[in-house]
């Protein structure tokens, strides 16, 4: 079954590379049953006054629909301007009872009481992706039939080992 991860992170006042590179790397590193939801996928310049409200509503709907939120708050960008949108997305995830995984190389993020208690915290994207792959990855079958072993099958195996003694 496919699982989805919403990729929350800075967009406003960021370069194209700062917006896209980490999202592309994470998407490529997820297991094949994990799909990334990129909030930047449908952004465009518009003079329409409601654009910011539309973006916020789209992002909220994406956080509702996803299975997990991965939030990236790098120190270099936080020092220029905190990503208020990303903090909103973390709060949405928390209130929607979604697992939230936060990645930051900024000790202020790791020590902030609201962020510290809202999800799993990591210093690197690699560690976070590994954690997500474990949480959302599909179990591999180990039986000859191609199906996972039946519940309790391990107990029977253990009992047979004990009876040989």
Where are the regions that the model predicts?
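Short, positively charged low-complexity motifs
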Residues: 141-145, 157
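Conserved catalytic or regulatory cores that recognize and/or transform ribose-phosphate-containing ligands
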Residues: 1-140
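Short, intrinsically disordered, low-complexity terminal segments
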Residues: 5, 147-150
């Amino acid at each position: 079954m496919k699982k989805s991860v919403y990729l929350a992170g800075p967009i406003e006042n960021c370069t194209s590379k700062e917006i896209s590179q980490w999202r592309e790397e994470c998407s490529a590193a997820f297991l094949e049953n994990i799909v990334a939801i990129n909030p930047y996928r449908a952004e465009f310049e518009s003079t329409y006054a409601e654009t910011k409200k539309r973006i916020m509503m789209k992002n909220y709907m994406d956080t509702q629909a996803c299975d997990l939120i991965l939030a990236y708050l790098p120190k270099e960008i936080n020092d220029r301007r905190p990503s208020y949108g990303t903090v909103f997305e973390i709060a949405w995830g928390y209130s929607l009872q979604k697992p939230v995984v936060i990645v930051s190389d900024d000790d202020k993020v790791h020590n902030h009481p609201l962020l510290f208690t809202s999800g799993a915290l990591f210093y690197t994207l690699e560690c976070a992706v590994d954690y997500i792959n474990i949480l959302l990855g599909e179990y591999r079958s180990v039986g000859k039939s191609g199906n996972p072993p039946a519940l309790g099958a391990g107990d029977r195996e253990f009992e047979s080992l004990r009876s040989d003694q």
